[in-house]
Amino acid sequence: MAQQKKTIAVVNATGRQAASLIRVAAAVGHHVRAQVHSLKGLIAEELQAIPNVTLFQGPLLNNVPLMDTLFEGAHLAFINTTSQAGDEIAIGKDLADAAKRAGTIQHYIYSSMPDHSLYGPWPAVPMWAPKFTVENYVRQLGLPSTFVYAGIYNNNFTSLPYPLFQMELMPDGTFEWHAPFDPDIPLPWLDAEHDVGPALLQIFKDGPQKWNGHRIALTFETLSPVQVCAAFSRALNRRVTYVQVPKVEIKVNIPVGYREQLEAIEVVFGEHKAPYFPLPEFSRPAAGSPKGLGPANGKGAGAGMMQGPGGVISQRVTDEARKLWSGWRDMEEYAREVFPIEEEANGLDWML
């Protein structure tokens, strides 16, 4: 029997996570009701042309009527809010209330992030901690819910002068990445456009009977900065070097909130070398652990389990995502197949 097609409510539809889900969900016949802040721009125009997708334009802050409309007749919801839209805690709580009020939502997936201050002697990362507050609110409401934690987007890399993930093109044709991350500590990575949608669709297919209340790390690969640069070097056939720096260099105007985010990253990951995901269920052995339990390194890496703080049995951080979606794209493939195309679209010509 064919699976019943359902209606999915989505916010921030032009964002990488939401757009990835919309593309694959609509392609297999689901209907999507999606909020956008503007109908202008390449992604918004793309979404308008996709069958089975209905867009609702408007802000989320203090806009309960739009939220009620968005959830009308929806069976499923994927919610990824951003600080740029306004008070993220207020928006997140209002969305959860609206979903609960609709009475039709069978599974609510919320894109969360950790509050580091709750798990160790570290400050909170300001653009992440509000998401964790909203996660706890959703849990209290009793919505059938799952919480996904996205790794660092591969797609963040650019040779444009944006902070933290600039692959700077040097005069000799090589690239350098300057960031505060420890060069040898693995970080979680995700090709958001390619892999978020299929993974979320599988979570919805499995349903809350499998995933209710569960946290899932949406990361398919853990690589240290040195390993990332090695993957780029192999893909581009150019030397790519990582340089650890204590401070993120700011070359363009950025909002105050993002500047504060970068300052927290310098402290949490640069000075303190804190884990990216400090939650016990995402604990994983550090580099140098016994074979099979160390950081993932490429698609053939083995997997292991360990007991983390509080007795929580922790899967290797990539395991659940890889089981949800086996067609994931690794960093080397991204750097070879996608990075040059994105660069050319941004008006750059180093690859020609």
From Swiss-Prot:
SUPFAM superfamilies: NAD(P)-binding Rossmann-fold domains (SSF51735). It holds the Pfam family NmrA. The keyword NADP applies. Monomer. Interacts with areA. Induction: Up-regulated in nitrogen-sufficient conditions and down-regulated in nitrogen-limiting conditions. Keywords: Cytoplasm, NAD, NADP, Nucleus, Oxidoreductase, Repressor, Transcription, Transcription regulation. It comes from Emericella nidulans (strain FGSC A4 / ATCC 38163 / CBS 112.46 / NRRL 194 / M139) (Aspergillus nidulans). Its main location: nucleus. The lineage of its organism: Eukaryota, Fungi, Dikarya, Ascomycota, Pezizomycotina. Belongs to the NmrA-type oxidoreductase family. Changing residue 266 to Q: No changes in the Kd for NAD; NADP and areA. One of its GO terms (biological process) is negative regulation of DNA-templated transcription. This is Nitrogen metabolite repression protein nmrA.
